[in-house]
Amino acid sequence: MSNSRQHQGHFARKRFGQNFLVDHGVIDSIVTTIGPARGQRMVEIGPGLGALTEPLIARLATPESPLHAVELDRDLIGRLQQRFGPLLELHAGDALAFDFRSLAAPGDKPSLRIVGNLPYNISSPLLFHLMTFADAVIDQHFMLQNEVVERMVAEPGTKAFSRLSVMLQYRYVMEKMLDVPPESFQPPPKVDSAIVRMIPYEPHELPDVDPVLLGELVTAAFSQRRKMLRNTLGDYRETIDFDGLGFDLARRAEDVSVAEYVGVAQALAARRKAAE
């Protein structure tokens, strides 16, 4: 596989984190994993040169119910419009600022399926942005750096368990689906990749906790991950009765389960409300 940054006459742009998928066997496996069906409301983030776009459109799109795609590179937008016409509705812009809820069906029922080969340089911020639309989403399938996927699905007590693990596991059921080697791309990235499936919990399955408050607490806990929680969560000791919660501060952030973090965030919310 050539290391050239040019593919199909387009130069991959480093600032957009572009690595184009070119292995047709891998593409077929990804599409099979996604399982698109006619009439579904699907959004592709970063369609690039259309490697996934084409088989997705073949499986689900009609002029009345097109595949939606969010693309930042205006050079690619023109090519995609010309190639796919009314079967692809393109939204020019940055996925980090895009309102995905605007593409959902009317009503409260989740309707969006979101897919994409996400730019690795913005993957974590984009995953957090997408969390704000989780109630409108049926599922998500993303190509990501393998290291990021391993962190997403990591168990407590492992080195890979992180702030990303806690926040995403609170909101989604996640599963690593496929490994994708560098030679599947043009130009080949310097890292291994993987496909992850993310299914949001339904409202009745979610714990009653403020996600902003949970994020505040988890960020503090992991701010110095080699230190004990008595240090990183020290500012909360006057507010929260950790002993009463049975929460051991003589641990590191990676040793605490998602449920325990949720419990502490709930206790913090109750104390702050009582102090109002």
UniProtKB/Swiss-Prot annotation:
What positions belong to coiled-coil segments? none
Q: Which residues bind S-adenosyl-L-methionine?
A: N19, L21, G46, E71, D94, N117
EC identifiers of the protein: 2.1.1.182
Q: Just give the chief location class.
A: cytoplasm
Instruction: Provide the protein's localization.
Output: Cytoplasm
Q: Which GO terms describe its cellular component?
A: cytosol
Write the record's keywords in alphabetical order, separated by commas. Cytoplasm, Methyltransferase, RNA-binding, rRNA processing, S-adenosyl-L-methionine, Transferase
Statement: the UniProt record of this protein carries the keyword Oxidoreductase:
no
Q: Which InterPro entries match?
A: KsgA/Erm, rRNA_Ade_diMease-like_C, rRNA_Ade_methylase_Trfase_N, rRNA_adenine_dimethylase, SAM-dependent_MTases_sf
Catalytic activity field: adenosine(1518)/adenosine(1519) in 16S rRNA + 4 S-adenosyl-L-methionine = N(6)-dimethyladenosine(1518)/N(6)-dimethyladenosine(1519) in 16S rRNA + 4 S-adenosyl-L-homocysteine + 4 H(+)
- GO molecular-function annotation terms? 16S rRNA (adenine(1518)-N(6)/adenine(1519)-N(6))-dimethyltransferase activity; RNA binding
This molecule's function is given as: Specifically dimethylates two adjacent adenosines (A1518 and A1519) in the loop of a conserved hairpin near the 3'-end of 16S rRNA in the 30S particle. May play a critical role in biogenesis of 30S subunits.
Q: Which NCBIfam families match?
A: ksgA
Similarity comment: Belongs to the class I-like SAM-binding methyltransferase superfamily. rRNA adenine N(6)-methyltransferase family. RsmA subfamily.
Q: What is this protein called?
A: Ribosomal RNA small subunit methyltransferase A
* Organism in which the protein naturally occurs: Burkholderia ambifaria (strain ATCC BAA-244 / DSM 16087 / CCUG 44356 / LMG 19182 / AMMD) (Burkholderia cepacia (strain AMMD))
